[in-house]
Amino acid sequence: MTATAQQLEYLKNSIQSIEDYPKPGILFRDVTSLLEDPKAYALSIELLTERYKDAGITKVVGTEARGFLFGAPVALALGVGFVPVRKPRKLPRETIAETYELEYGTDQLEIHVDAIKPGDKVLVVDDLLATGGTIDATVKLIRRLGGEVHDAAFIINLFDLGGEQRLEKLGIHCYSLVPFPGH
């Protein structure tokens, strides 16, 4: 099933926009409203699964926390393993970490050292692409473990915040279901 304009419009309409959140001047795109609509949630998983069903994906990686909500069901539908990438000290086994820049400081992500094997063909899934910092760090973690990142897939792309261009510089193709301007 290729996504139709009607399906994509349905998904877009299921995402609420909240003005002045988390601070004045920001228009927040709330993907949790899509999750509250079982038709929209199922459709988003179906469309992502359909796109990647014949791509030879061996692992799906989801970033904390909303990436888990989309990545895990896609992995299940594809019949492959799901790998969580988390904030520091949230994973129980041995991990490697990658630090990345935030607007005001830095943060870090971790992955289990045995979660990705050399040669794994990985799909990275998250709810939203903005500046690309989180996915940049996630891609670096996967590559350090010998995995090949096939694509990065998102529900929402805030297309004017530069995330897609940042990831393309890393050789990562981005796919998103719903484009919005960033604010």
Swiss-Prot record:
**What Gene Ontology terms describe what this protein does at the molecular function level?**
adenine phosphoribosyltransferase activity
**Chief location:** cytoplasm
**Has keyword Phosphoprotein?**
no
- Gene Ontology CC terms: cytosol
Look up the record and give one Gene Ontology term from the biological process aspect: adenine salvage
Which family does the record claim for this protein?
A: Belongs to the purine/pyrimidine phosphoribosyltransferase family.
According to UniProt, the name of this protein is: Adenine phosphoribosyltransferase
Q: Which gene encodes it?
A: apt
